[in-house]
A protein has these predicted regions:
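Alpha-helical transmembrane segments and their juxtamembrane interface "caps"
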Residues: 1-182
Length: 182
């Protein structure tokens, strides 16, 4: 069920980009990349502030995660809070970029026609959607609760989004896991 929902969200992302056109979608991709860079600058300090605001489920005896090694189990709260901080900064900066994109969309411009441009725009939009889904699913994967871990582990699409996206998987693990807990 989760796999179907994730595939529908990705298909919706493709459709939205297909309808927008390539120029606007390139702008949104640049906005997402800028948001990711900005979030990478501020997420640590912000993540530390969430310890008092958001509860984190402590691991129970015999409970673990499918996506992280067991020796990191008692340090995953740092990854969880850093991920929340990163996602928050990313969301704020990207929302500003989207607002500016709406204004950009109102300017008269020549729309690049043709299926190739539309399909390219759809793929770019799907990549941005995939990155946002990957951030959210990776944050969920840090929570050591069976009610969260089991559905994620059983979903083929969720597992691949968390573990197998070529560039962003290693990058997110580098900034969220390796930089924080080693």
């Amino acid at each position: 069920m989760i796999s179907l929902l994730l595939l529908l969200v990705l298909a919706w992302g493709f459709y939205i980009g297909y309808r927008r056109g390539l120029l606007l979608q390139v702008y949104y991709l640049i906005s997402a990349m800028t948001s990711a860079f900005m979030a990478g600058q501020f997420y640590k300090g912000l993540g530390e502030q969430f310890h008092l605001l958001l509860p984190y489920a402590n691991p129970q005896e015999g409970q673990g995660t499918f996506f992280f090694p067991s020796d990191q189990l008692f340090q995953l709260d740092k990854v969880f809070y850093a991920g929340i901080g990163y996602l928050l900064v990313f969301g704020i900066v990207y929302s500003i970029g989207r607002l500016l994109g709406l204004l950009l969309h109102l300017l008269p411009s020549k729309k690049l026609g043709g299926k190739l441009f539309q399909v390219s725009a759809g793929i770019l939009s799907m990549l941005v959607t995939l990155f946002v889904l990957q951030m959210a699913l990776t944050i969920l994967a840090t929570i050591p609760m069976a009610a969260i871990q089991n559905p994620l582990e059983k979903s083929i699409v969720a597992k691949h989004i968390i573990q197998s996206i070529p560039v962003t998987t290693s990058w997110l693990k580098q900034i969220w896991v390796t930089n924080l807990i080693g």
